[in-house]
Amino acid sequence: MNIHQLNVQYDERQDRLLVRVKTVQEQEVRLWLTRRIGVKLVEPLMTAVARIEALDPAVTLADEASRKILIDLKQEDFLQKADLQTPYSNTTTALPLGELPMLVTEVTIHLHANGLTQLVIKDGGDEGQQARNCTLNLQSFMVHGLLHLLQQAVHRSQWLDPIESPDQEESAEQAEQARRTQKKIYTH
């Protein structure tokens, strides 16, 4: 499967991430990522990016702090070169996994010595549906791209925003009110 485009969008109604993978042959794989899978996938992808970049001798020889800086610079370089402006093409000739997105229940990441990253994506199925899976072979720039799109979508979903209880909101309002009404004391 030669991947041409990736798209990750937050669907507020479903409260899921819709991942669409388009091939050069105009085939499209559609995947639903739940909050649990979407958030948990970010760290392994970051690790995969770090391992891919560690294949570069300049990165390998660096100390830990320098290695992190070099990896961050490579991510920035990717973002500068990536085509993030071209809209995702909605023309599709085939949907190998069907029209409905596959609900992802497990993702396994394998990094190969040549820098190719393999994602084995599974849907355990349930009573009404048969288990499905697909394998995506991503070149390093696609891993960078998927990580970037996933991070953006998770941010838009607000899944990682802290949840404030009414008590916390009330306490914050009371503290602000007390600060505003507090008498100013001047000393000489």
Listing of model-derived features with the role each one plays in the protein:
Residues G38, L119-E176:
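Mixed-charge, glycine-accented linear interaction segment located at domain edges/termini
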Residues I37-D83:
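Short, well-structured hydrophobic secondary-structure segments
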Residues E43, V49-A50, M102, L116, ...:
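Acidic, Ser/Thr- and Gly-enriched intrinsically disordered low-complexity segments
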Residues T23, Q27, L31, L55, ...:
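Alpha-helical rod/repeat scaffolding segments in eukaryotic adaptors/tethers
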Residues V59-I71, L100-H112, S165-E173:
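DNA polymerase processivity clamps
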Residues M1-L17, K74-D126, Q182-Y186:
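Intrinsic, low-complexity N-terminal interaction/targeting segments
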Residues M1-L55:
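The feature marks the first
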Residues V107-H110, Q152, E170-H188:
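A eukaryote-biased signal for long
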